[in-house]
A protein has these predicted regions:
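Short conserved segment of the HATPase_c
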Residues: 136-148
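Short helix-loop "hinge" at the ATP-lid/N-box region of the Bergerat-fold HATPase_c
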Residues: 105-106
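Helix-loop junction within the histidine kinase core
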Residues: 39-50
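Short alpha-helical Gxxx[C/S/T] motif in the catalytic ATP-binding
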Residues: 161, 165
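Short alpha-helical segment of the dimerization/phosphotransfer core of two-component systems
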Residues: 23-28
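Conserved catalytic submotifs in the C-terminal HATPase_c
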Residues: 49-54, 73-85
Length: 198
């Protein structure tokens, strides 16, 4: 049946249609997962599982997971301390936060670089995702963390990702914000405690 229906299209057209179908299916799946996450977070049923996380391994794995989304010619980089850092946190939730920030950076960066970095600052560890994309107006620094808030309508998405990131970061005892002083694109910062309260 599907073969018959596709007979009227050329190979190129079929490939393009399948590409659109794949993209829209992924968007729908993302929306469903985001709504489920929000529902759990709001109901207080979102549990975390703390463990000792080796940050170089987690960050390298996170970058590998988004590498296919990076525009041609854009550099994807990791900046980290020389010494290995082990953080007691929820690895899955931290990776979810960083992945979301990196995916957003990929959407809005067509040239230059996207950098994931982390460092210790006092009793906190500071992660950042910095890009050389179109940037974000500082007036939208808080607005973008609200649900269904999008920077534009040109890129796919539903405006739930950053809201979920903020809820997850709070759950991990930290905070997330847009660095409004950075003017070379966009820079998001996630601060987590080195030793989270039990």
């Amino acid at each position: 049946m599907l073969n018959d229906a596709g007979a009227e299209f050329s190979e190129e057209e079929r490939s393009e249609l399948l590409g659109h179908l794949h993209t829209n299916t992924n968007l729908l799946l993302t929306l469903v997962n985001d709504v489920l996450d929000l529902s759990k977070l709001e109901s207080g049923n979102y549990s975390i599982s703390l463990s000792n996380v080796v940050l170089p391994e987690l960050c390298q794995s996170t970058l590998a997971g988004v590498a296919h989304r990076v525009a041609e010619g854009v550099r994807l980089e990791l900046k980290q301390p020389d010494t290995e850092i082990i953080l007691n946190t929820d690895a899955q939730r931290l990776q979810q936060i960083l992945t979301n920030l990196l995916v957003n950076a990929c959407k809005y960066t067509s040239q230059g670089s996207i950098v994931l970095a982390y460092e210790i600052a006092g009793t906190s560890i500071i992660f950042s995702v910095t890009d050389t994309g179109c940037g974000i107006d500082k007036e939208k620094g808080e607005l973008i963390f609200q649900r269904f808030e999008k920077l534009d309508n040109m890129n796919p998405g539903f405006g739930l990702g950053l809201s979920i990131c903020r809820s997850l970061t709070t759950l991990l005892g930290g905070k997330i914000y847009l660095d409004t002083q950075y003017t070379g694109g966009a820079r998001f910062v996630v601060e987590l405690p080195l030793h989270p309260p039990v």
